[in-house]
Amino acid sequence: MNEEIIIDVQGLNLWYGENHALHNVTLPIPNRKVTALIGPSGCGKSTLIRCFNRMNDLVSGCRVTGDILYHGQNINGTGADPVDLRRKIGMVFQKPNPFPKSIYENIAYGPRIHGIKNKRDLDEIVESCLHKAALWEEVKDRLHDSAMSLSGGQQQRLCIARTLAVNPEIILMDEPCSALDPIATSKIEDLIEELKKEYCVIIVTHSMSQASRVSDYTAFMYLGDLIEFGETRQIFENPHKELTENYITGRFG
């Protein structure tokens, strides 16, 4: 791989209590590309993506060994600040989760927490992030309406805009389209294509067609193991492992 590596996973193991959920995973994540994590339910893909911004810290009994290097620094090392990490590595969840506030306040909330108080600066951030999330034209005349009044697809794009507002480098997406209709899904996929021009995007998806459409690289996981990783075209057209081929062709899943 000739790409710049922004996250380098080295020998990662994770346990939930006695359950060994990830087994010695080693995976390079390239910057300004889309990497898809695929595999059947329970394979560890959501567990892995939550390691990247230490969301698993919040799970009782979770234990991790191995290294996750972000710009060469181990995110699990002593002195690493998980709050700062989650600003740099944002998360978009399966179900849209806007705050019960106005559209404007959903986006301004994060920058305010990080010390930005000037209204003109906040206005610029809100407009810029809504443009990047392809939502500005739809909401520019109702910024002070409740975010809960938006459609599901609009709410998910608002959540993406909210993530962008604190200036991350990496955007994690855990099945971001599973609760959306085909039209809303298409808009999110178009947005992902634009986002990778500025950000690293890592997406968990159950949809083989979505992974093949939106990603540059694909990692196939099964029962906590990373089975195969490579360029998406190679994974889908010429997988090196029989297990990968069986999953992609629908022989199991």
Swiss-Prot record:
* PROSITE patterns (alphabetical): ABC_TRANSPORTER_1, ABC_TRANSPORTER_2, PSTB
Q: How does it assemble?
A: The complex is composed of two ATP-binding proteins (PstB), two transmembrane proteins (PstC and PstA) and a solute-binding protein (PstS).
Biological processes per GO annotation: phosphate ion transmembrane transport
Task: Kindly indicate whether the keyword Nucleotide-binding belongs to this entry.
Answer: yes
UniProt name for this protein: Phosphate import ATP-binding protein PstB
What EC number(s) is this enzyme filed under? 7.3.2.1
One Gene Ontology term, aspect cellular component: plasma membrane
Question: Annotated Gene Ontology MF terms?
Answer: ATP binding; ATP hydrolysis activity; ATPase-coupled phosphate ion transmembrane transporter activity
Instruction: Identify the taxonomic lineage of the organism of origin.
Output: Archaea, Methanobacteriati, Methanobacteriota, Stenosarchaea group, Methanomicrobia
> For ATP, which residues are the binding ones?
G39, P40, S41, G42, C43, G44, K45, S46
